[in-house]
From Swiss-Prot:
Reactions mediated catalytically: UDP-N-acetyl-alpha-D-muramate + L-alanine + ATP = UDP-N-acetyl-alpha-D-muramoyl-L-alanine + ADP + phosphate + H(+)
Highest taxon, organism lineage: Bacteria
Species the sequence originates in: Listeria monocytogenes serotype 4a (strain HCC23)
Metabolic or biological pathway, per its Swiss-Prot or TrEMBL entry: Cell wall biogenesis; peptidoglycan biosynthesis
Keywords in alphabetical order: ATP-binding, Cell cycle, Cell division, Cell shape, Cell wall biogenesis/degradation, Cytoplasm, Ligase, Nucleotide-binding, Peptidoglycan synthesis
Binding site residues for ATP: G108, S109, H110, G111, K112, T113, S114
Protein encoded by which gene: murC
Family per record: Belongs to the MurCDEF family.
GO BP term, example: regulation of cell shape
Annotated localization: Cytoplasm
Protein name in UniProt: UDP-N-acetylmuramate--L-alanine ligase
Amino acid sequence: MTIYHFVGIKGSGMSALAQILHDKGFQVQGSDVDKYFFTQKALEEKQIPIMTFSADNIQEGLTIIAGNAFPDTHEEIERALELGLPVIRYHKFLGQLIDGYTSIAITGSHGKTSTTGLLSHVVGAIRPTSYLIGDGTGSGTKGAEYFALEACEYQRHFLAYKPTYAIMTNIDWDHPDYFKSVDDVFNAFETLGKQVKKAVFALGDDAELRKLSLDIPIIYFGFGEENEFQAKNVIKETTGTKFDVYHRGEFLGSFEIPAYGDHNVLNALSVIALCDYEGLPVEDVKKELKTFEGVKRRFSITEKANQVLVDDYAHHPSEIRATVNAARQKYPDKKVVAVFQPHTFTRTRTFLQGFADSLNLADEVYLCDIFGSAREKTGNLTIADLAHKTKGNHIIKEEHTEELLKYPEAVILFMGAGDVQKFQAAYEKVLDHEVLTEADLKKSAIN
């Protein structure tokens, strides 16, 4: 039996796919840079070997699954090609893997990961389900009937998939290094829609998705009256959100989610719509929606000292706006401080004013240096260009996160798609030191 070797195994999709193959009984290993990523925890728990990149890792008998961030000139891929080993790109392998399942591809400019996680949780509790989530979580469930997968639009990679269903959460202009306009993004989504076998579930409040023209049913969901599945009577509380769902004007049920913001209501509504279409019991769906704990790096909360720290993947103006609004709902009486690390120079330059406008919805804004992706290392833009447009003109360094101590009782949002977690980790050390120092002072006073 071949061994599957993942080039770039710490990538979120790659990590999830490796876990799926491992669960299905295949031998799996992989390589990546010698730096800790949150995705590797699950790999280590499953005892999947992780090596540092080296051509010496590539031996006879391997099947290579190559991450899309790595060109054919990468040393491991070059060695594999020299040896005549099969080399398959991640998205193409996944496209082959989902055949034979009732597959559900979740895509959209925003909300893919959260919706895939929610769908996997709900459907997986009702029927055997394999899933691949973009937070690095994957499961190859034995006897699975369904396969839920996050489908990324970047470079049209999702066109490798021919799923049974697709959920389209929204269309927005992102990845400006590849997509030239929102029309370009729309064309990619419509092309995917034409490959879907049974039905597409699409946000009907999205003007772009309303333009879809397909030969299969398009089931629209949203807040508007014209949607087949409509969310109404939304009640936003500090513990979560309640709402009623109507299907073609008929009351379907009252639902509750332990999540915040309109975007999470819409994510849940898409899942409810698909489950109803598939005939899954509505009471089971209600029950499972209540117990979803979220996905990694999406409004992940840590309470420390007298502050609330939130880790979030938001890296587009629309996502920042949604994250700030969610924080306002859950913590209406607290000050909201945004700590943002822009991801890629191209995206930052393209949406510079949009970033400023969304960040300024917070009470205070701190900016980290721009994170260049694997595709792009340099740019003429600097973080100062964005800082000049935001409240306070604050730039924060990893070595000086103590500035955030100025905001007791605040919610601090650490947002970005790069490695903004290191800023949170540095700040948590500052908080730990402050707590220890305070304890020492109290001890000295007693003595």
